[in-house]
Amino acid sequence: MLPLADLRFLMFVDDVYEDLELWYPKLRLIEAGAHVVVAGPKAGEKYAGKHGYPCVSDAAIADMEAADFHGIVIPGGFMPDKLRRDPKVLRLTREFAEFGKPTAAICHGGWIPISAGVYRGVRVTGSPGIKDDLINAGAIWEDAPVVVDRHFVSSRKPDDLPAFCRAIIDVTTRR
């Protein structure tokens, strides 16, 4: 049996997402048996990654509910800087964190949990470019390929994706 069989994960997408940070976790979760829903500002819309790779959203963020999913994965790129201004994105992220569901962010994806106010006192990593933002939000910064603190999983950059995905699967299967 696959470790994530019949579990559902939410991922966010918008223009200028980091291509590998969306596609690698999405495919790894699917390989592990999960159903992944990629939600953007509009359902069925094509969004372009930083390197031009397209992603068509499965659903609109406005239609998503944290109760319908087992975890969330937030890719980086410049997309999180746009989506962190969306109250629905922040509410969803807060709910995943408050429900104790796997809440994973890589690179600049940490901007969304920062704006959602869920990183205070949490050990995390992220892109060195947002280190000060993480610390100022009350997070405990660690420079490591992956940091796991309870149900929170974070990584720094695309090179960390193998460790990031292993940690997401591990945290999910321990629940």
Model features per residue range: what roles?
Residues 1-99, 103, 112-123, 131-175:
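Extended, subdomain-level signal for the structured scaffold at the beginning of enzyme domains
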Residues 107:
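Catalytic nucleophile serine of serine hydrolases
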